[in-house]
Amino acid sequence: MSKEELLFCPLGGSGQIGGNMNLYAYGKEEDQKWIIVDTGVSFADDSIPGIDLIYPDPGFIIDKKDDLLGIVLTHAHEDHIGAISHVWPDLKCKIFATPFTAVLITEKFKEKKIDITQHLKIVQLNGKIKLGPFDIEFVTLTHSILEPTV
């Protein structure tokens, strides 16, 4: 019988600026529950002609979407939310965001004619949520955009 463990799987953004997408899992190997923290993009430069946006491949978590509890967005910079409307249609899970971030991602989905009203959960600054085994607090900090959290 396996014991419970916490896993961290960075799909993008670790050790670089841009493309932030981190996965966390908790539980026994045969019953792990997952969350995604941020779904960001990076911006291509002239070295990749014809490419505008780059974001992490979500294939790993798409394969585990039945055990995915939701996406938690830390703040509204593009390197943290820019891929949400590209990634979410394959996941169709709950999205947790502060009010300002929620407004911006709602507009991203409107551009793609996707209504996320039923899936979007607004969390106030310093608010707390529980997703399965995860207790998450939206702790505020100083940053260059409204309502940043960690």
Language-model regions, residue ranges each:
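His/Asp/Glu-rich metal-coordinating catalytic cores
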Residues: 1-72, 77-150
